[in-house]
Structure formats: structure tokens, C-alpha cells
């Protein structure tokens, strides 16, 4: 039997969640956007790479305000979230040439939200055949690019949008 080793997953699976909100922590550290994989900050929203992505280029669009419910977003926050979602779909198209996207939010822990108390939208680029047997049978994802490489590629590409 062949084995695929993904030791980076043990960091996610085995660690305890730090106290506080990971999004708020990333937002507070203004001097280290690259270390936190924050790609862009606007007035009410920011965009960052998912630290445990489903595919290369998996992004999170997050309101700066710590708010857990879609229904409690301010109109300006909702507008900026979807404005940046559009902008980063264009960015991902240029940088990675995906064939499609999944866009969505998991509202509540039972719905699959990893950070249920801070609303965020996922942008997941998709390619034909990217969900093969590895994900379905082995609960494993094969990532072809490191997060730092993805971050730098998107930081450069966003300048052209």
C-alpha cells in the first residue's frame, strides 16, 4: 500500500485552538500581513489565504468587525464583502486559471464553520478532477503550492485588477 504523507495537516488536526479569534488576531497585527497571509485590507473588510485550504488559492473574505451572523452585517460590510469577492475571483482567474469556483459561508458550528463567531466567505477555485479519490476516500488533499508562493502570486496579480 502506498502512503501519502501530509505532516502539515497534523498541525491543524492536533492543535488546540488558541484563545480569541484568529481573524481578529490577524487583523490586529498590521506589520505582518505576509506572515498572516492577509492580501488586502479595505475600510470594513480584509482578504486572507485560508491556512488549511481545500485547493490552491482558497481565500477568506472577512469583515473587520467581529460579527458571527450574516444577518447582523452592516450594509456597507455586506457590500464590501461581495465587492472583494468579485475582485478576488478576477485575481484568481488571472493567477491560477481555475475552471470554476465555490463561493460560500458556513453559518454555525453544526454547518461546518471552523470559526463560527466571526462571519467569513470562502472563495475556493476549482479545476476539473480536483476532487478525486484522495478527498473522498482518504480525507486528504494534495496541494501543489506552498502558502507563501500562493500569497506572493496573488499579491502581485491583485495589482493588475
Question: Residue locations for each model-derived region?
Answer:
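HIT superfamily nucleotide-processing domains
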Residues: 1-161
